[in-house]
Design a protein with these regions (language model features):
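Predominantly extracellular/luminal regions of secreted and cell-surface proteins
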Residues: 168-180, 335-371
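Beta-rich carbohydrate-recognition and catalytic domains
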Residues: 22-208, 220-267, 282, 290-335, ...
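Beta-strand-rich modules
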Residues: 547-568
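Extracellular low-complexity, O-glycosylation-prone stalks/linkers
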Residues: 515-541, 559
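Short S/T/G- and acidic-enriched coil/turn segments that sit immediately N-terminal to beta-strands
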Residues: 242, 422, 451-452, 541-546
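Aromatic, loop-rich ligand-recognition surfaces of beta-strand-rich domains
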Residues: 370-439, 449-497, 502-504, 514-517, ...
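Short beta-strand elements bearing conserved aromatic residues within extracellular beta-rich modules
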Residues: 170, 424-426, 522-524
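Extracellular fibronectin type III
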Residues: 480, 563-578
Length: 578
């Protein structure tokens, strides 16, 4: 009897353990896979679309809370990876807008973000319940607020979202309803696009329209105050976050030589601005930001996160290198180094042959392998007869998948929509005849519009097949089906003919190199010192880059590397470009 009992117990443990292994993940991939809200402040457009932007992420009593523009609530996590949505007892009817959040000594959590711009500071000691109360005062003319209480219990508010006005700040009286302590605020940060190339407006910084400064956030580190801000516009690939550094909360502040400190202009998911910086597991900082999608509407957006560091000289930088490929998750503390947490899994599906059960001519199935967040495939019908098959062209080791769903001509989804889910089966094959299941979501009840799936063990495959079962709404529309792993061929050889020509307008540089055979793309890296190449731009389908994000009078150092599905070439360095 005892032997039988022990055997059954062992089998149960083995079964539970296998389930745990199957769903445990040690990596993540941008865009973040959240159950984004359908905002309705633009319902007059007649389009339903998901969006998430301007994340304010704070730690509170060892857990994390994320407040996001127009979301009708907020998210909670124990590990910065797995987020569950909280519908609070009390909240803004229209959803908060560009919110601020601050943890005051683990006693109360403060938040503000009234869309009207006139607001009380809200507080609670139970954010899971969401019984928010209002401080009995109203602060006016606050766009994109940021709230900060220093170690000495002095409180400050920062704000700004304008192409006319600067980021401003003022001290509040923590003992008297957080009323302002001075009649006039301090003007703290102005954009200088004539000097700082990255602050110029437009896609790739090519517009002469006056840029926007917005989204402040304050981080105190080693006694210094890092006042962060976003520019030049949320609807562009070059939306990023810069930083000024000072010795006191209201400055004076000095422009950091390495700027923008968080910047993701190339690749699949572009944009990384209007964010927040939070200390996560193991004391490692994470910067959350905003990705631009801007198809249904210019403010259609997604969220991203990057490990963020302060180097030995106090330079703040986010690791956006391969920033939309799998990276180690925040709980993998020992693998988060100053060189970043890129997992090393390459993109196997880029530009590979693909076929489908059906397609609209205007949205062909080739869009699911083009590595462009703005394009998507639409099937003729939304039924369980639809499928997609990708030929990786060689047998490879598949480690992870990302499936991106899209809202196409939807008109009936508003706010927090119940029972949203995506149901499907993903299979793999070596020969296109015999198939094995990689991921079975046919009975899923989870809303996962950017579902990232890390396999419990690598799968040998040449063909990947998506078999559709159900999505809500009128249409089946999918962006990229991204397959990550390692090919079994050769890495690219090192780049040759690498040149950087700084323009007479020092904000610009023309970077070029000779094409490398068998390459998917290239990473161009640059920085203000040979050991500070903290910025990078992923380039597909070209062997040149017009870089327009440099600072007048600042020396820069550059490097380039090639990559494909098999790995990354040796990096080629250029000592200096004046």
């Amino acid at each position: 009897m005892n032997k039988k009992f022990c055997c059954i117990a062992w089998l149960l443990l083995a079964f539970v353990g296998s389930l745990h292994a199957q769903y445990r993940t040690t990596t993540y991939c941008n865009p973040l896979n959240l159950d984004y809200t359908y905002p309705f402040h633009n319902s007059h457009l007649g389009k339903s679309y998901r969006s998430g932007a301007d994340p304010a992420v704070v730690e509170f009593r060892g857990e994390y809370y994320m407040f996001v523009t127009r979301s009708w609530g907020y998210w909670h996590s124990k590990d910065l990876m797995n987020w569950d949505f909280i519908t609070p007892e009390k909240w803004y009817f229209e959803g908060c807008n560009a919110p601020a959040a601050h943890n005051y000594k683990d006693s109360v959590l403060y938040v503000c973000g009234n869309p009207s711009g006139a607001m009380s500071i809200l507080y609670t000691d139970n954010p899971k319940r969401g019984d928010w109360k209002a401080v009995p005062s109203v602060l006016t003319d606050l766009q994109d607020p940021a709230f900060f209480i220093d170690d000495d219990d002095r409180a400050y508010m920062y704000w700004g979202s304008s192409n006319r006005w600067p980021i401003r700040g003022k001290e509040l009286d923590i003992k008297d309803k957080f009323l302002p302590m001075a009649k006039k605020p301090d003007s703290l940060l102005y954009l200088r696009p004539d000097i700082h190339g990255w602050e110029r407006f437009g896609e790739n910084h090519t517009s002469d329209i006056k840029p926007f400064i917005e989204g402040p956030w304050m981080t105190k580190h080693n006694g210094m105050y890092y006042l962060q801000y976003a520019a030049p516009g949320t609807q562009f690939n070059v939306y990023g976050d810069g930083v000024y550094v000072g010795k006191s909360p209201l400055g004076p502040f000095e422009y950091a030589a390495h700027n923008p400190f968080c910047y993701k202009p190339g690749g699949f998911a572009t944009g990384a601005g209007h964010g927040s910086t939070v200390r996560g597991p193991g004391g490692i900082y994470w910067h959350f930001g905003t990705i631009h999608l801007s198809i249904n509407f210019k403010f259609e957006r997604r969220l991203c996160m990057f490990p963020t560091f302060f180097d030995k000289d106090g330079v703040m930088y986010s690791d956006t290198y391969f920033g939309d490929y799998p990276h180690y998750s925040p709980d993998q503390v020992t693998r988060q180094t100053v060189d970043g947490g890129f997992r090393g899994w390459m993109l196997l599906s880029y530009a590979k042959p693909v076929k489908a059960s059906s397609q609209l001519e205007s949205h062909p199935v080739t869009n699911v392998t083009d590595e462009n967040l703005k394009t998507f495939w639409v099937a003729e019908k939304n039924d369980d007869k639809q499928w997609v098959e990708i030929d990786l062209e060689q047998v490879s080791d598949v480690y992870a998948l990302q499936l991106n769903f899209f809202d196409y001509e939807e008109t009936e989804f508003w706010g927090r929509v119940p029972d949203l889910r995506q149901c499907y089966l993903v299979e793999a094959s070596v020969d296109g005849v015999h198939w094995q299941v990689l991921a079975d979501y046919r009975n899923s009840f989870r809303d996962a519009p950017h579902n990232y799936i890390e396999l419990d063990r690598p799968a040998e495959a040449r063909y990947i097949r998506y078999r559709h079962h159900y999505v809500p709404g009128k249409n089946l529309a999918m962006g990229d089906i991204r397959v990550f792993g390692l090919g079994r061929g050769k890495k690219p050889t090192a780049v040759k003919g690498f040149t950087v020509a700084r323009d007479t307008d020092e904000r610009n540089a023309r970077i070029s190199w000779q094409p490398v055979k068998g390459t998917q793309g290239y990473n161009v890296l640059w920085g203000v010192a040979p050991d500070k190449l903290y910025s990078s731009w992923m380039v597909y389908g070209d062997n040149s880059l017009d870089l327009r994000s440099l600072t007048v009078g600042q020396k820069y150092y550059f490097a380039v590397e090639a990559f494909n599905e098999n790995g990354i070439s040796q990096r080629v360095f250029l000592k200096e470009a004046r």
